[in-house]
């Protein structure tokens, strides 16, 4: 699993993609209306696909509602990721203390690793001695 900052960046990228998809949906499927009696709606050319594919009002509104809910859900996920970032509720001293504790844990783990490597080397020496004694017979 990726770290929180990467998750946050991915969530923001996905939110931007959702904004673009929402804009495209509204731009593509809105109802054509005039602002004044003098306005006219230009007919689309026969050899070109229509620029607007008007949907029935109830279908269009349902689509808008679903897209709005998706945007809200994604925004809430971003808020959660932001709130879970370290350091927002911790002072600098708390963060330094946490780093010191992590360094101590790392030192303990490194000592364990070194002991395991030493034990492995000892076992290899014993195995080598055993194999050499078997060859002599």
UniProtKB/Swiss-Prot annotation:
Keyword line: Activator, Coiled coil, Nucleus, Transcription, Transcription regulation
Disulfide bonds: none
Disordered: annotated span: 37-56
InterPro entries, sorted: Med7/Med21-like, Mediator_Med21
Main localization category: nucleus
UniProt key word RNA-binding: no
Coiled coil: 87-130
GO biological process: regulation of transcription by RNA polymerase II
GO MF term list: transcription coregulator activity
Record Pfam families: Med21 (PF11221)
GO cellular component, one term: mediator complex
Places the protein is found: Nucleus
Function, as annotated: Component of the Mediator complex, a coactivator involved in the regulated transcription of nearly all RNA polymerase II-dependent genes. Mediator functions as a bridge to convey information from gene-specific regulatory proteins to the basal RNA polymerase II transcription machinery. Mediator is recruited to promoters by direct interactions with regulatory proteins and serves as a scaffold for the assembly of a functional preinitiation complex with RNA polymerase II and the general transcription factors.
Subunit structure of this chain's protein: Component of the Mediator complex.
PANTHER family named among the record's database cross-references: MEDIATOR OF RNA POLYMERASE II TRANSCRIPTION SUBUNIT 21, RNA POLYMERASE II HOLOENZYME COMPONENT SRB7
Protein family according to the UniProt entry: Belongs to the Mediator complex subunit 21 family.
Protein name (record): Mediator of RNA polymerase II transcription subunit 21
């Amino acid at each position: 699993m990726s770290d929180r900052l990467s998750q946050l960046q991915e969530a923001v990228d996905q939110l931007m993609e959702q904004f673009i998809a929402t804009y495209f949906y509204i731009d593509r499927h809105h109802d054509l209306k005039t602002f004044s009696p003098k306005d006219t709606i230009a007919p689309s050319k026969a050899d070109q696909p229509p620029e607007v594919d008007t949907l029935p009002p109830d279908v269009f509104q349902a689509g808008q509602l679903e897209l709005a809910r998706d945007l809200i859900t994604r925004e809430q996920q971003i808020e959660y990721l932001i709130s879970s970032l370290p350091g927002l509720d911790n002072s600098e001293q708390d963060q330094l203390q946490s780093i010191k504790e992590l360094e101590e844990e790392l030192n303990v783990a490194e000592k364990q690793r070194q002991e395991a490597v030493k034990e492995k080397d000892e076992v290899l020496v014993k195995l080598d001695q055993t194999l050499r004694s078997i060859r002599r017979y």
